[in-house]
């Protein structure tokens, strides 16, 4: 029997939910969004996670469980509450200059939550794997450009094409080159301690 109460995929997604809830309760995002309903939906998702954590289901029964379906449905609802597709760009572009950096950080954490929830079913479909790395999404991308980090000689900043969108990532791999295929982990470094160590092990999205 698989112990779902210790499944990293479920634990990481629920932790991201808690962090997201704290952000949308306190952050001053500027834009046309339904803050009240987003908070309510994130709170209501807790019972789904609790039920899923102690379901001890396996295989298709776990992947296709009502709890997983409800979590994903609520995740999609939160995206709508935030403003739909492009909500992250709206919040960042509307942020005052003095709050831009903090807004980008908060948006990154909320996006991690959204990715964790909407991708939960696919990760659970991989089966009972007892490894923390399974709790995050990893996608393959192509490096489009590489530049040195302005504040750290041991880091590189890369523009990576994921197909549907391009992102900026930071890595300590000094041998990366344009045209390389790389694996990119989708998680905010603050969710893992110590963040510096984790960033040295994984490609980390920064925008």
Regions inferred by a protein language model and the residue ranges of each:
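Phosphate-backbone binding interfaces of nucleic-acid-interacting proteins
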Residues: 1-207
């Amino acid at each position: 029997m698989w112990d779902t109460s210790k499944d990293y995929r479920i634990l990481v997604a629920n932790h991201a939910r808690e962090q997201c809830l704290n952000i949308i309760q306190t952050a001053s995002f500027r834009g046309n969004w339904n803050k009240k309903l987003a908070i309510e939906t994130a709170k209501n998702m807790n019972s789904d996670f609790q039920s899923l954590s102690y379901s001890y289901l396996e295989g298709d029964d776990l992947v296709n469980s009502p709890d997983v379906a409800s979590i994903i449905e609520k995740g999609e609802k939160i995206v709508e509450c935030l403003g739909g597709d492009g909500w992250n760009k709206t919040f960042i572009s509307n942020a005052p200059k003095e709050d831009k950096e903090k807004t980008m950080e908060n948006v990154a954490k909320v996006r991690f939550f959204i990715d964790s929830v909407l991708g939960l079913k696919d990760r659970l479909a991989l089966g009972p794997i007892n490894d923390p790395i399974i709790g995050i999404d990893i996608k393959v991308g192509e490096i489009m450009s590489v530049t040195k980090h302005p504040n750290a000689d041991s880091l590189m900043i890369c523009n990576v094409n994921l197909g549907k969108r391009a992102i900026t990532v930071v890595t300590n791999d000094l041998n990366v080159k344009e045209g390389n295929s790389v694996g990119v982990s989708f998680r905010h470094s603050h969710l893992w301690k110590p963040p510096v160590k984790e960033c040295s092990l994984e490609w980390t999205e920064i925008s």
